[in-house]
Curated annotation (Swiss-Prot):
Pfam family, one: zf-C2H2
Protein family membership: Belongs to the Sp1 C2H2-type zinc-finger protein family.
Gene that specifies this protein: sptf-3
Organism: Caenorhabditis elegans
GO molecular function: chromatin binding; DNA-binding transcription factor activity, RNA polymerase II-specific; RNA polymerase II cis-regulatory region sequence-specific DNA binding; zinc ion binding
Protein name (Swiss-Prot/TrEMBL): Specificity protein transcription factor 3
Disulfide bonds: none
PROSITE patterns xrefs: ZINC_FINGER_C2H2_1, ZINC_FINGER_C2H2_2
Ranges of Polar residues composition bias in the record: 44-53, 398-412
GO BP terms, alphabetized: animal organ morphogenesis; asymmetric neuroblast division; nematode larval development; neuroblast development; positive regulation of apoptotic process; positive regulation of transcription by RNA polymerase II; regulation of transcription by RNA polymerase II
Length: 412
């Protein structure tokens, strides 16, 4: 080569170096990325110096249009991870809160159930106390009623035994006789003046006062005769005996009328109805002192066909409905029912039933209380009524008879 060619070579080399310094070749490599996700471009030196293979990695800012989607995607991925982490923590906290709420709700339900049970027990106790109070008041009321009846009977018996103090001005009516007491001065004035006593209706006048042996005086009011008490002159006694002097004769009475008159006071002294309108005297005249016992006036007893085979049992018949009873007291109570007089009323709440006899009221009250006082000795079964118990005991008797018959058949 010539010298000129040799001279040109270093010149060209210098130019190439300058060009390399001014312009570096940029080579894009797919696998070169930084930890933050940005791309790195490889700069290669010129090929004039093959021996020198120096490689430099220099981060270069890429155009916004190329780098923006990568950074956005990275940011989105980081944001999603950050969102996932708090969302998972929120879910855990929410689950814990829900579990706590469920536990609180369960505890509240248990407390409400316990409160309901307590309220129910308290209500049941109140109801039991009310029923006990009602039953106790009913028993007390019944005992008070029985005591009052006994006191009335005792008072009536004492009145029958003791002399009855009355005044001359007695009132006599066709249905009922009412007696009143007046002051002793009025009695003495009437006795001294020998004047008769006028009745309330003004229809009957008393006979004049007539002296009796021993200084006693006697007054007649129709068919009633009053005699002065020897111990106390201010008291008067009713007597059935007529005056010693001749007077207006009383009309003759039939035996049936006398028996009816005897039955009326017995019914009144037992606290029963006054049957004077039905069985009393036809003329409306007063009645004398009644005996302690009186004969039954039912049709069966009047006809004297009431004795059966053994002659011990009696049957009393109601003349209104032909019902039969074994006791005269039951018949009298039944007659009270016909007259509408039912003195024994049930005191239970919302119960307006009435009865003619106290035992019927007691039997009815057991339907409210549920008491079963009659127990079977064989099987222990309980009943409210004694007749139900006797009917039940017959089943045991029939079973015994059947067993005995079967045993006899086997032995034979």
């Amino acid at each position: 080569m010539s010298k000129s060619g040799q001279q040109q070579q270093p010149h060209q080399q210098m130019q190439q170096q300058q060009q390399q310094q001014g312009k570096m070749m940029v080579v894009h490599h797919q696998r070169t990325t930084t930890p933050d996700g940005s791309q790195v471009y490889l700069l290669q030196p010129s090929q004039s110096h093959p021996q020198q293979r120096q490689v430099q990695f220099i981060p270069i800012q890429v155009a916004q249009g190329e780098k923006k989607p990568q950074t956005v995607m990275m940011n989105q991925m980081m944001g999603q991870q950050q969102q996932q982490q708090p969302s998972s923590s929120n879910q855990q906290s929410q689950q814990q809160v829900q579990q706590q709420q469920q536990q609180v709700h369960q505890v509240q339900q248990v407390q409400q159930h316990q409160m309901q049970q307590q309220n129910q027990t308290v209500q049941q106790q109140h109801l039991m106390m009310e029923t006990i109070d009602q039953v106790g008041s009913g028993i007390i009321g019944n005992s008070n009623g029985n005591n009052q009846q006994q006191q009335q009977q005792q008072q009536q018996q004492q009145q029958r035994r003791d002399p009855i103090p009355i005044a001359p001005a007695g009132m006599v009516s066709g249905q009922r006789m009412q007696q009143q007491q007046q002051q002793p001065q009025q009695q003495q004035q009437h006795n001294n003046n020998n004047t008769g006593a006028s009745t309330s209706n003004g229809g009957v006048n008393a006979a004049p006062v007539m002296p009796v042996m021993g200084g006693q005086q006697r007054i007649t009011l129709g068919n009633l005769h009053f005699q002065q008490d020897p111990n106390d002159p201010q008291k008067w006694i009713i007597t059935n005996e007529g005056p010693p002097v001749a007077g207006p004769s009383a009309p003759a009475r039939k035996p049936n009328q006398i028996q009816h008159r005897q039955m009326i006071p017995q019914m009144n002294e037992d606290g029963m109805m006054n049957m004077g309108n039905d069985y009393g005297d036809i003329n409306g005249q007063g009645l004398g002192e009644a005996p302690k016992r009186c004969a039954c006036t039912c049709p069966n007893c009047l006809q004297q066909n009431n004795r059966q085979g053994d002659g011990k049992s009696r049957i009393h018949i109601c003349h209104l409905c032909n019902k039969t009873y074994g006791k005269t007291s039951h018949l009298r109570a039944h007659l009270r029912g016909h007259a509408g007089n039912k003195p024994f009323a049930c005191d239970w709440q919302h119960c307006n039933k009435k009865f003619t006899r106290s035992d019927e009221l007691q039997r009815h009250r057991r339907t409210h209380t549920g008491e079963k006082r009659f127990a079977c000795n064989h099987c222990g079964k309980k009943f409210m009524r004694s007749d139900h118990l006797t009917k039940h005991e017959r089943t045991h008797q029939s079973n015994r008879i059947n067993n005995i018959n079967q045993q006899t058949l086997r032995l034979s």
